[in-house]
């Protein structure tokens, strides 16, 4: 079975300066080491080494100081074997880093039975990336979310006063309501109109914030 050191050596040998530059421009801080592997390459390693069956190694990767190794661990870890204490520990570790890591952590939490407890807590956080994770989790659970309408109203009323990445995730929540909740489709369109254009600092990139109304309508047209 492959070890942490062997994985670290393999990833380092695959270092990609161009991707490193892209990831730094997207917000990966200098405080984290970075080899610049693409997500597809990480997933190939997971399949080859059957890392999803090695929970302990995945945890070890997550608790490293290398963004590639951390994300590899987040992709491989068993959500139901992770403790609530570990989740909060990782939240603290990642909340002032960059969105790739918090996106990965939110994806783990979304697969757990207690996901909505974290979402409810995290949207009240003072940390932008933590709050953003809360809204991401709510979006993942949109079809099993009795409070969806109340959250949509909150997004409508407060999005523009929220911090950077939180605005992005709240905009995503409005879009999710508009696409997947027939009973909230019109209210989501109304919310998007009320909110107006959403500005988010996405780093030195050409990435743009999705326009909620056009995104909803295009997605609905594809479905229908």
Curated annotation (Swiss-Prot):
CDD domains noted in UniProt: AlkD_like
InterPro entries: ARM-type_fold, DNA_alkylation
Source taxon at top rank: Bacteria
Transmembrane residue ranges: none
A Pfam family this chain is assigned to: DNA_alkylation
Name under which the protein is recorded: Uncharacterized protein Lin0241
Organism: Listeria innocua serovar 6a (strain ATCC BAA-680 / CLIP 11262)
Taxonomic placement: Bacteria, Bacillati, Bacillota, Bacilli, Bacillales
């Amino acid at each position: 079975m492959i070890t942490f050191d062997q994985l670290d050596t393999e990833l380092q040998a695959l270092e990609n300066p161009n991707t490193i530059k892209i990831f730094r421009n997207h917000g990966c801080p200098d405080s984290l080491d970075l080899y610049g592997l693409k997500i597809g390459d990480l997933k190939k390693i997971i399949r080859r080494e059957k890392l999803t069956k090695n929970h302990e190694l995945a945890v070890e990767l997550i608790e490293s100081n290398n963004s590639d190794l951390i994300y590899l661990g987040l992709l491989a870890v068993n959500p139901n074997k992770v403790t609530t204490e570990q989740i909060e520990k990782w939240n603290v570790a990642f909340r002032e880093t960059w969105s790739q890591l918090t996106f990965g952590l939110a994806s783990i939490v979304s697969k757990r039975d207690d996901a909505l407890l974290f979402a409810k807590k995290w949207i009240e956080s003072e940390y932008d990336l933590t709050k953003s994770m809360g809204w991401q989790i709510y979006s993942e659970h949109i079809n099993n979310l009795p409070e969806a309408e109340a959250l949509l109203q909150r997004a409508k009323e407060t999005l523009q006063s929220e911090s950077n990445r939180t605005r992005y995730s709240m905009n995503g929540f409005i879009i999710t309501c508009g696409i997947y909740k027939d009973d909230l489709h019109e209210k989501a369109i109304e919310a998007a109109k009320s909110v107006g254009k959403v500005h988010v600092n996405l780093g030195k990139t050409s990435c743009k914030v999705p326009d909620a109304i056009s995104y909803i309508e295009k997605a609905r047209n594809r479905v229908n």
